[in-house]
């Protein structure tokens, strides 16, 4: 008898290849050191995670520009060119998801730290997201799942 009834997938980095590097590597002319400095000091992961927890991207961008006006153009790109950060599905993981769904042995849901403002773009781009019985999006719930 199978004791596992439910399977939970994360999305970013598991089923979907997302990275700001796809935008900023070009903007920094391949200079990884400068790009990483920008991530560590201007558009930080903590800053992005705040939007994943439901904070307005527009407000967050405006506030960040006030803090770092010299970087206005680059800050605006973070959400202004967000679609370019969203690449392809991760084939092996999607294949596994499809096999699990086809088996009809499990309830399969997704749990993701993702902004409610950008998640509809992912839904439109990735048809496999319709395979889930439910998707819990941190930005819709106004909280994030912990990383530690």
Annotate each language-model stretch with its function:
Residues 1-43:
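Active-site neighborhood of HAD-like aspartate-dependent phosphohydrolases
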Residues 10-13, 54, 100, 110, ...:
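Generic structural signal for small/hydrophobic residues in well-ordered secondary structure
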Residues 14-15, 20-22, 114-118, 141-143:
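Short, solvent-exposed loop/turn segments at secondary-structure junctions
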Residues 24, 42, 61-65, 78-83, ...:
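Hydrophobic alpha-helical core bundles mediating ligand binding, dimerization, or RNAP-core interactions
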Residues 30-41, 68-80:
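Short, surface-exposed acidic
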Residues 48-79:
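A metal-dependent, Asp-based hydrolase signature
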Residues 73-109:
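Short, acidic loop-to-helix structural element flanking the phosphoryl-transfer center
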Residues 116-148:
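Substrate-recognition "cap/lid" segment bordering the active-site pocket of phosphatases
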